[in-house]
Amino acid sequence: MKGTVFAVALNHRSQLDAWQEAFSQPPYNAPPKTAVWFIKPRNTVIRHGEPILYPQGEKVLSGATVALIVGKTASRKRSEAAAEYIAGYALANEVSLPEESFYRPAIKAKCRDGFCPLGEMAPLSDVDNLTIITEINGREADHWNTADLQRSAAQLLSALSEFATLNPGDAILLGTPQNRVALRPGDRVRILAKGLPALENPVVAEDEFARNQTFTWPLSATGTLFALGLNYADHASELAFTPPKEPLVFIKAPNTFTEHHQTSVRPNNVEYMHYEAELVVVIGKTARKVSEAEAMEYVAGYTVCNDYAIRDYLENYYRPNLRVKSRDGLTPIGPWIVDKEAVSDPHNLTLRTFVNGELRQEGTTADLIFSIPFLISYLSEFMTLQPGDMIATGTPKGLSDVVPGDEVVLEIKGVGRLVNQIVCEESAN
């Protein structure tokens, strides 16, 4: 699997029924109006026959579903035209720990090593009326039909491509029911559906696997960008949030990356698009269960990113929605990677943002809530960080709106200067 794996939460009617009462109360206050997207990063993806790793002391749930595989580049496509952009479908297992909330990114539940088995692709005549069967150790444990999904495969492709360009090889997991099948070490989980190659994976205790296997994740040219929400206390206060007690980590899709001296599009009819100057840590070698004391040994260097956000699209659940943070070209990054040896103290760097030459934002990495070693240790405790992966460490206070015609310049002392222009939708087309 070479592309990005997108997944959607709350797309099965049984989930909405189960959460209906909760969604009428704080912090949600209303059910979701749009699809609730998240990303399964590359460390999660395994093939037929490879082991699902069972973390000690956790409850692990199987999530049988179907993956739509994108066949050609799709941007802003109507659902009626979606079939032209679909190469085929594959069975998938959206493995997860139990979720007690949809209010924050569920990276610890969703993004562990091996938590996204994907089967072989095949054409399918009717994905919207497909019975999906889960067998555990040769016996049926569950079945459900895609007719009960809230949004069809075509509707999901259309909704996602409205703000994110989909590329050949990308996958969209169509959703899972509320009730999932519990797994145990030693189980063999097999997923079946008429017309698609079966997907079968053993479940192996994580510590046993580590003792008996030498395992190297396949590397790709593009690493995963993990981003931090509210990692500066002054920024949390600026947005009227309490500083988090645990890192709020979300994932940026590759479609959102753009380079130095490139443009970012402000959508028409929005009221608030703001910049976010961030120090980015680049991982230099594979990291798994790394202590804080040794974490900096795994850093290759640093760069700068601008994590633009469209606040109009932020709904009050499962933050942040991809429509806010993963739109095409919304994350300028660069202009280069500075070797870690050239930065004597990454926790004492000044960040500044200028809009049309006017200083709008200024802060220091000394005010990070969660330090770089802590973040590397935290993430590597439950997932494998790979060379080329990146961690955007958050932004300080000082946000303001930007409009077409603005030049936005980010500076981090000792790391780099990143320049970007804002354009309207018409100029981008």
Swiss-Prot record:
Gene3D superfamilies (alphabetical): Fumarylacetoacetase-like, C-terminal domain (3.90.850.10)
Organism of this sequence: Salmonella dublin
Assembly and interaction partners: Monomer.
EC numbers, comma separated: 5.3.3.10, 4.1.1.68
Residues given in the record as a divalent metal cation binding sites: 276, 278, 307
Protein name: 4-hydroxyphenylacetate degradation bifunctional isomerase/decarboxylase
Domain of life: Bacteria
Family: Belongs to the FAH family.
InterPro entries per UniProt: Fumarylacetoacetase-like_C (IPR011234), Fumarylacetoacetase_C_sf (IPR036663), HPA_isomer/decarb_C (IPR012684), HPA_isomer/decarb_N (IPR012686)
Keywords: Aromatic hydrocarbons catabolism, Isomerase, Lyase, Metal-binding, Multifunctional enzyme, Repeat
Role, per record: Decarboxylates OPET (5-oxo-pent-3-ene-1,2,5-tricarboxylic acid) into HHDD (2-hydroxy-hept-2,4-diene-1,7-dioate) and isomerizes it to OHED (2-oxo-hept-3-ene-1,7-dioate).
